[in-house]
């Protein structure tokens, strides 16, 4: 459960991401594909090369979903319901992949926002991404 301090940290950190959200989302995906090659199996139709339009497009989708989650941090299950349905019933993404992408997002944010990525902010973002992952996998049952 996210504390009020966690919510404040997440909103502040995501606010600093600003217009770079799509780029950071794409970078996190690239990190995931390089670090965890098995994740590529969910994207057989994508050009997974560095800077590809498809990876950039999906990175923007990831970032947009996180922006929605930040804006609706107190009601993520409703805000992300359609996305949860998509990943559970149509895409059938193995839930472990959300943890892998979350890790890559944390690394990307730490690399781009080093002065803002304090231990407290890191912990809050980690809890937030775990909450998003839980919501996205909630309909697998």
Curated annotation (Swiss-Prot):
Family as reported in the entry's similarity comment: Belongs to the globin family.
UniProt keywords, alphabetically: Acetylation, Heme, Iron, Metal-binding, Oxygen transport, Phosphoprotein, Transport
Residues that bear N6-succinyllysine: 7, 11, 16, 40
Phosphoserine sites (modified residues): 3, 35, 49, 102, 124, 131, 138
Tissue specificity as recorded in UniProt: Red blood cells.
Domain of life per record: Eukaryota
Record note on quaternary structure: Heterotetramer of two alpha chains and two beta chains.
Gene Ontology MF terms in the entry: haptoglobin binding; heme binding; iron ion binding; organic acid binding; oxygen binding; oxygen carrier activity; peroxidase activity
Annotated protein name in UniProt: Hemoglobin subunit alpha
Globin domain span: 1-141
Modified positions (Phosphothreonine) in chain numbering: 108, 134, 137
